Amino acid sequence: MYPAHLLVLLAVCVSLLGASNIPLPSLDFEQFGKMIQCTIPCEESCLAYMDYGCYCGPGGSGTPLDELDRCRQTHDNCYAEAGKLPACKAMLSEPYNDTYSYGCIERQLTCNDDNDECKAFICNCDRAAVICFSGAPYNDSNYDIGTIEHCK
């Protein structure tokens, strides 16, 4: 995958963050993108994850359309749980600047032991999401569906 394409995908999801009014713990989007690249060997096809289903980024709504969309919903819910941790409260004011420590060896992700409680929780949210993405089929009919009419 081309890093610029992944950043475009993540930028779309970030734009949804601003509209959602949901406070979230830290997420380094470039780092999350690198996790995705580690696990999912998607070149240009990664662009197709933009505007997919009802849950691209926090603030999704409605019933997930398929397994991939459920992965995204679960990721949103995991971040909501992280936001309830006392250790994560301090990071809510700067949600995109903090990074966690992780490893990638032969397409296997691990969250490193040197993360504090909040970073470990967030790393595991992202790790679980990426693993879920890698096992979920992509359904072309769920791309660019128009969330207003399909995600109630």
From Swiss-Prot:
Q: What does the PTM comment of the record read? A: This enzyme lacks one of the seven disulfide bonds found in similar PLA2 proteins.
Q: Which residues form the signal peptide?
A: 1-19
Instruction: Give tissue specificity per the record.
Output: Expressed by the venom gland.
Q: Name one GO cellular component term.
A: extracellular region
Q: Does the keyword Disulfide bond apply?
A: yes
Question: What the protein does?
Answer: Snake venom phospholipase A2 (PLA2) that inhibits collagen-induced platelet aggregation. PLA2 catalyzes the calcium-dependent hydrolysis of the 2-acyl groups in 3-sn-phosphoglycerides.
This chain's protein is named: Acidic phospholipase A2 S16-19
